[in-house]
Amino acid sequence: MSEKRVEKKLIHYVKKALNDYRMINTGDRVMVCLSGGKDSYTLLSLLNSIRIEGNYKFDIFAFVLDQSQPGWDDSALRGWLDDKKISYEILTRDTYSIVKEKIPAGKTYCSLCSRLRRGIIYRYAEEQGFSKIALGHHRDDLIQTLLMSVFYNGQIRSMPPKLLSDNKRHVLIRPLAYCQERDIIKYAMEQQFPLIPCNLCGSQKNLMRQRVKRLISDLAKENPKVPSNILRALSNIKPSQLMDHELWNFRELNVD
């Protein structure tokens, strides 16, 4: 697939998500969380292109959190943002030391790291008056999270495309919800984003998400529709076919 075709495909699915879930309203100030990875770069790049088109009237701002990880170098990232003329701030908070201190060696850092990062993001967004917080989770993240929740937590839940935070103060959006990771990888390579690797968790193997990712990949080899079917299931709920008493009154179910 050519460079333009990949970009066109991704923009199509981002716009579909924006419209399906009314993610962005006229006049919104959207804070895009830029981690330095391929997903957040792609999100920021596509939203910036859509903003420049002019059909959606909103402002974007890139928020970068420097967590004081060894080897962190944001010089190329700064250059990329300056070149794109995107407003940004790089905030330094040493969550790295906290995570290393609290989590035993060999254990997964992701959960605590995410909680610390989320708190900083929410606080910054509130202080600066941003109306939306945009995250770079894509289609594969959504379907993997669903299966992880089922397998390891006994819950049917995932990452919704649009979410009101628990404290009711922030609206989170995931414009890449319909985008496939393989297309994002192609786009990131073509754009030559100056990626910053995560040295905190990048070396941890056999994480739950990687196992679920392999499972989905293996199933897709037998039936390519498996990933899209899982995604479609998230918006095709049949409460009467499940076992949740809060969603369906099974006790009072009788023949009239």
Swiss-Prot record:
Catalyzes the ATP-dependent 2-thiolation of cytidine in position 32 of tRNA, to form 2-thiocytidine (s(2)C32). The sulfur atoms are provided by the cysteine/cysteine desulfurase (IscS) system. This is tRNA-cytidine(32) 2-sulfurtransferase. The thiolation reaction likely consists of two steps: a first activation step by ATP to form an adenylated intermediate of the target base of tRNA, and a second nucleophilic substitution step of the sulfur (S) atom supplied by the hydrosulfide attached to the Fe-S cluster. NCBIfam families: PRK10696.1. InterPro entries: Rossmann-like_a/b/a_fold, TilS/TtcA_N, tRNA_Cyd_32_2_STrfase, tRNA_thiolation_TtcA_Ctu1. The gene is ttcA. Its EC number is 2.8.1.-. Binds 1 [4Fe-4S] cluster per subunit. The cluster is chelated by three Cys residues, the fourth Fe has a free coordination site that may bind a sulfur atom transferred from the persulfide of IscS. Pfam families: ATP_bind_3 (PF01171). One of its GO terms (biological process) is tRNA thio-modification. Pathway: tRNA modification. A motif (PP-loop motif) lies at residues 35-40. CDD domains: TtcA-like. Homodimer. Disulfide bonds: none annotated.
